[in-house]
């Protein structure tokens, strides 16, 4: 599979980057312990909060100890986690990772996690009592998300049956089509015409606009407009609940 250049990625992710730059205060991307340390020294922050979606899952995180705020070890600051997630109810840390992260987490002022299973994992493996809290996406009301959609002047969605499928397969596709036919709905997705897992070098070089991911508010509007939603992921379920689908 072709890996686009930095310049090509800036085009492919332009809608996502627009949302981040407009609505989220952020640093430059950080790729190492040294960069985390530099950011901390430059920012002179009073508190650090880590979270949320699978931030404590080793297979998804190449600098796991930094997700336990190792770069603040010598600082007199507040350390908290909000809705941190292990992404699984099984313990995936190596013995060494467990020792390092337990020592770091025990220095936190407050530990909250996204799942009940996370409470158990923290207690059993890291020696910390954690609190189960809401996913941060559920801290906002439906009206807050609709306000974003309106600010961006997002046009109406192209269908009535929104399918947000992260792991597509023929069985899921068949099910979506059957539901659409039975309910008289028009299925639609919010994805690039040329999806990442299938795109080639030729696709990126000759039709890069087809590789561009739709905007965040396009995705939010899909939940708002749809008469019915079919999803296979946690956040798909969450936004279905938020928009009463």
Predicted segments with their positions:
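Acidic anion/phosphate-binding donor-loop and adjacent secondary structure
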Residues: 90-94, 138-152
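A short beta-strand/loop micro-motif in the catalytic core of glycosyltransferases
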Residues: 108-115, 230
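Aromatic- and Gly/Pro-rich donor/ligand-binding loops
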Residues: 1-103
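Catalytic donor nucleotide-activated moiety binding site of glycosyltransferases and closely related
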Residues: 81-88, 119-122, 165, 172-215
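An anion/phosphate-binding loop that grips the pyrophosphate of nucleotide cofactors and donors
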Residues: 45, 108, 226
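Nucleotide-sugar donor-binding and catalytic loop/hinge architecture
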Residues: 41-44, 72-76, 145-160
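Donor nucleotide-activated moiety binding/catalytic core segment of transferases
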Residues: 130-138, 142, 200-232
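Structural loop-to-beta junction motif characteristic of Rossmann-like glycosyltransferase folds
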Residues: 244-245
